[in-house]
Each structure stands twice: as C-alpha cells, then as structure tokens.
Amino acid sequence: MKIGLFGGSFNPVHLTHLDVANGVLKRLGLDKVLFVPAGNPYHKEQGEMLSAELRYELVKKAVQGCSGLGVSDIDISADGPTYTVDTLREASRRYPDAELYFIMGQDSLETFTTWKGWQSIPELANVVAVSRAEADHGAMSQELKRIFPEVVESGQDVWQMKGGKSIYIIGDFDFVISSTLVREEWKKGRDVSKLVPKAVAECMNEKGDKLKKFWR
C-alpha cells in the first residue's frame, strides 16, 4: 500500500489543500493520502492557531466522503513537540507494510537541512515537493542536488535516492487560497464557502464562538 502523509497546521483546511492531496494521490497512484494536522504549539503563544482538536475535526469534515483521503492523529496525539522525522517513524510503526510518501511545499526545500534528523527523512519515506505551476523547476532541481548530491534523475521531475527512495516534484497547483485568507475573510463576517469545503464552512459557523477566541 502506498500512503501519502500531508502535514501542516491546517488553520483551517481549505480547498487548495484538497486539490494538492487529490493531485498527489492521482499523479503518483497512491492508495491513500492522510492529512496530519500539527499538534498544539509548545512553549509559545497559541496566537491565531485553533486548538489541535478543532483543526482535526475540520479536516475530518473536509475529507469525509472523499475517496482516498483521510486524516491521522499522529501529531496531535503525540506527547510533546513533534518533528517530521518523528512523525514518519511513528507512521512506519503504524503502517509497517506501507510505502510512505512525505508531501511538503516546495519552499520547504530552502530550510530542509535545518530540520531535526533531516538526513533520515528520505530513508523513511519518498519525498514529494509540490509547487505552483509557474515555479522554476530548474532551480528546484539544483537545490535538490545541493541537498542530496547522490541523487540521480530517473525521469521528468523524479530523482532516485541512494537508498532506493525517490523525490518527486509536482508543480501544477494553483495556490490562490491560503489559510490566512480564510481567517481574514471569516473575521470580516464574509462567506467562506467558496474557499473551504461545504462541511468545513458549516462546522465553522456552528463553532463560531470557539473560533472567535482565536481569530479576533
């Protein structure tokens, strides 16, 4: 089984998140893509970040009825702060027979080598970098070779790692919607039903009092 892990704060989840998850699911022939909402912030102010439980609930609403999409509590159920490498290790424990695909934004490549245990990430999972349609794939290719000098290009926007895992760049997404935009529109009292899945918009309306505690 091929499982994609799509991590993020999802504060809140929106339609572009679903587009990315569905796009990766179909392009790479995965069996499932699991959204992995981040846990509550540790040792810092919560700010506009909704509680982990509420963000998880909104993602659950978003993927309900979406074939191939699901949500995981790997990060929100962890005791203490979580890092990508820890998330992947826990996913490997939960899904021992699965081939894992870690989905991240292309901009994360710039800080990838600062992540805890980053060298272990491509040993635990294939890496999928998603980007805008107009992104410079040539520059991204050079960045990949800088981070992983041993990579060998094995196809268009596909690189083979030394240990057998692959790195994919999928760059045809439209990122016009952001969580920041959704929050700002919601705070202004505007309809966000064209920015988030219908079930998410309904849940946000039902839990308006809870949202107001964070989105002021």
Curated annotation (Swiss-Prot):
Stored Pfam families: CTP_transf_like
Question: Which cysteines share a disulfide bond?
Answer: none
Cytoplasm as a keyword of this entry, yes or no, is no
Keyword terms = ATP-binding, NAD, Nucleotide-binding, Nucleotidyltransferase, Pyridine nucleotide biosynthesis, Transferase
Tell me the route in metabolism or biology where this protein functions. Cofactor biosynthesis; NAD(+) biosynthesis; deamido-NAD(+) from nicotinate D-ribonucleotide: step 1/1
Q: Which region is the signal sequence? A: none
**GO biological process annotations for this chain's record?**
NAD biosynthetic process
The record's catalysed reaction(s) read:
nicotinate beta-D-ribonucleotide + ATP + H(+) = deamido-NAD(+) + diphosphate
Q: Keyword Transferase, does the record have it? A: yes
**GO molecular function terms here?**
ATP binding; nicotinate-nucleotide adenylyltransferase activity
For this protein, the Enzyme Commission number is 2.7.7.18
Q: What does this protein do?
A: Catalyzes the reversible adenylation of nicotinate mononucleotide (NaMN) to nicotinic acid adenine dinucleotide (NaAD).
State the PANTHER family in the record: NICOTINATE-NUCLEOTIDE ADENYLYLTRANSFERASE-RELATED, PHOSPHOPANTETHEINE ADENYLYLTRANSFERASE
The family note in this entry says:
Belongs to the NadD family.
Q: What protein name does the entry list?
A: Probable nicotinate-nucleotide adenylyltransferase
Q: Which organism is it from?
A: Maridesulfovibrio salexigens (strain ATCC 14822 / DSM 2638 / NCIMB 8403 / VKM B-1763)
